[in-house]
Amino acid sequence: MIDKEFLTFSEKPRELPTVALRGLVVFPDMFIHFEVGREKSINALKEAMDGGQEVFLVAQRDVSVDDPDYDELYDIGVIAKVKQLIRMPGKNTNIRVAVEGIARARLIGGVAGKNSKCLRSLIVPVSELPVAEELRDYSRALVRHAKELFADYVEVASQMPVDIVTGVMQKSEPGELADYVAG
């Protein structure tokens, strides 16, 4: 769980269609493909495509739950832009989706509709508080050290893609670097 002291609300609450993710976490600035099979998730993605293409992606606490409710979702997720939906061939109804994470958001609650075909969440985008000036030098040193450790890893790792190495080395903020490496 993210410590609430390190986050600040950056906008007013808004409502978005929601996809509960199993065993997957999406971060801001991350581009990812994954498959969706649950009817509510497919409907949420279709609703997003019919609207502004934005969807709230949030991990569910227990991956064995087939139809999670809001209390079974984590508090922090990501607002993402749906880039592409592709129906998978075969008998299953799975859809392959491509999304790009935009910003972190806090789940405030669910928006229940009588005939709701998908999860809809009331969310508020959040941003990290800036690093205090007295910790700035320490923060820079940690980023520098993390990059040095990554460079050491690249030397022993086989077939490390150049774009990943470049991406890590271009990050200067601790949060951005952590999101990039985690993603």
Predicted regions: what is each one?
Residues 1-183:
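N-terminal low-complexity, acidic/polar interaction/targeting segments
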